[in-house]
Amino acid sequence: MHVKRRVLLALTTAALAVTSLTAAPAVADPAAVPGRDFGNGPERNEVAATDPVAAKRSAGPLGENKAGVRQGYPRKTQLRVYPEDTTDKSIKLGLTPYHAIAPRLNALQARSDRISVEVVGQTGLGRDLYLVTLTAPETARETRQQDAWRALIENDPVRAARDKGLERGYKAPVWINNNIHGNEWEGTDAALRQIEYLATTNDPAAKRLLATSRVYFNVTANPDGRVAGTRANSAGFDMNRDFVTNTQPENRAMRDMIIDTQPVIMLDEHGYVAGTLIEPTGPPHGQNYDFDLYIKHGYTNGLEMEKAVQGLGYPEAQEVVVPFRDLPPGEWDGWPPIFTAQYAMYHGAVSYTIEIPLRVNNAAYDQLPVEELRRRSAINTDVSEATMKTTLAYLYRHRDELVDNQIEIFRRGAAGEAQRYLPDGFVPGFGPEDRFTTEFPRAYVIPAGSGQRSATAAARLVDLLVDHDVRVRQATRPFTLGGRSYPAGSYLVDMHQPKRGLANAMLEAGKDLSNDAPQMYDIAGWSHRLLWGASVDIVKQGQVRVPSRDVVAASPTGGVDAAPGRDLALRVLDGKDASAVNDLLGRGVELRRLADGTVVVPAAERAAAAEVADRYGVRFTSAPNEQGSPLRRVTVAAAVSADELFALREMGFDVRPVSTATLNAGYDLSRVDVLMVSSGLRYDQLVPAAKAQVDALFARGGVVTRGATGSRFNADAGLLPVTAVPGRGDANGIVDVDNSGASVLAGSTPQSFVYSPQWFVNLGAGVRVEQRYAPGNPLVAGHWLPNDDGSGGPTQASGQAAVVSGEAKGARVLMFGTEPMFRAHPKGLFAQVAAAIYWGATR
């Protein structure tokens, strides 16, 4: 058994901590991985989100961007400039503030015909995102030929492999992404150095590189975070966790850059790991990759980058960590496609995360002298630039092999070939712990008609797949596949397609990795098939001959099926259903809520219902002859994490962020209907006046809690008589659940998501179990081990209450031990939160 040596990194990391509300013995969570940012840490449980719209917005740009000719290269844009911002956190480090980037790029465009600059989007606060291309000039005809060759590589890789013109003339693309974490600054400055060098140098080697390549730079992926000195963007999202959710505009821009440029190799520049860290990752590796095609170049160039960094001569950058070689399983894995590098691999790139060595953010930024910070940043910039220069040199030397490599990835996918078995020693250090493969199904079907749980969710899933360059077709006639019959309009994902790895990574269940690694760097379970609310069937084998058409966008799903004059009904099975309800409430429509959660719209409001049906893709049916309870516009006071705040607003709720501090400062709760608590609110720390306001809210409204912070609030406030039992702190993944006893959560999906799972025992009188963990081992995919003393594992959660509800002190209370809005990803679980809020607000 090959065992990788462990390198100890001198880093400051947050210990895993989960508040225990049970009498079980205290057990230390597993030690944090070097450089690891715990996926469910203080930022989600202890620090309540504030309103992003209240964040400091920079002064607006001067003028507009003026794009020039777009038929060839260069493609120049006279960039609008932003007023000087003396508060930009880059300045203290001696680095380039955001407002100085546009003038610098404008000046380079005036000097050189090798540089192109395009604005590919805006941040949440309205700052421009710059894509810079360095390449030898091209006529419009030459650019059309490059585009045709790039398309041929993906669409017909067999022909591409034989195309002699492509072999001679295709410009191999490389994409370098910088500053996705706003307080990891130096990649941007290294990129600007390389941009200027490649645009202006007379070095024949550089000119030869640009004659055979296109070099793309995302100059700063997170301008708002760069200016503010925050890891997250202005909405509070870690964007290096958002690639298969795409909630953020910056992430959508990066996704499109990857798809449009189709790089054969890419870098994602980060910080800070002592000595420098250069991927490939350690195991577990994503099981949907053609790993042989990645690792043979990935490891070789990784070692070349290591040598280049060490060659700079800085003592602080000599102990370079290559996780594939140096770290044991789970310490720096490449399992989920949520990271930039791991996502880009599914588009045919040999990809790397780079971590530069010297910390200048967080406490270091505040405590170190300016001279020391600038010394560190200068070294970091040199290290980052060394990885860029080395990779560009590798691209030049191995252009043919890297292009062939990408062609072969797409060819195998289109042919539906099995992954290759890699023997031990395939590259130095490759062993059994690196061997992760899967069996691809023949197809997935997203049914239309009665076999579909939610047409709204199905359409959203289809649109997401298409946005990620996964090929989806829609049946034009009824068909039978895998022993099931489907109506016309059903969607088909044929797994014989170039990017079958990404398609399967999004649609498969995943894997229980609990026995493959002692911990994981971040999440280990996700599945759009199981967590996004749509019914999706697996076709394991057989011929796929279905009359169908290519899908560019999902077909409309909204409508009103009730006869004129009838009241209308809407079941809230999806977050989009909640959006429609909240839209109607915002218009002043008087709605009723039935005992099973169905929302009734008066017949007189049919026109409004038709409008929201079209807007959100929901479908109204005839309402039953039941009275129900009035449902009015709900105002939610939310002490929640940033991702939960985003998800609540995505559903259209009127949300007022609160915390212990804001309530103690006198925040008025008199117009609030429901209090949601998951982060940053302690009942026992409220001053008497604030506590009186909260108690008054109990008497008239509802309470929804999530996680350890929510459970502590429930206990301290004396609400539901339950004991919350914490699972292991870093346990996460998809779990099977039993909804058979549900009242509030009736109609929920049979799977849920957990991170730091909880369950509830010692249920007192009046407490109802809304959802239970399935018997046996409920974990479907992810990583969930018990603590060292045997507590907190999945078998302890077996059959236990995962979600409970009841009434106490006049309040309707619902408590989640699951994570229905984690990073705004599990869209199919959002309706559970909406149902809890509506139930809590009605009487």
Language-model segments: which ranges?
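Acidic/His-rich structured neighborhood in mature extracellular/periplasmic domains
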Residues: 183, 239-241
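Short, solvent-exposed turn/loop segments enriched in Gly/Ser/Thr/Pro and often Arg
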Residues: 218-227, 269-275, 709-710
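Short helix-loop-beta-strand segments that form the rim/entrance of peptidase-like active sites
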Residues: 169-177, 190-232
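Gly-rich Lys/Arg/Thr-decorated short loops/hinges at beta-loop-alpha junctions or inter-strand turns
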Residues: 232-238
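Proline-aspartate-enriched helix->loop->beta-strand connector
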Residues: 258, 262-272
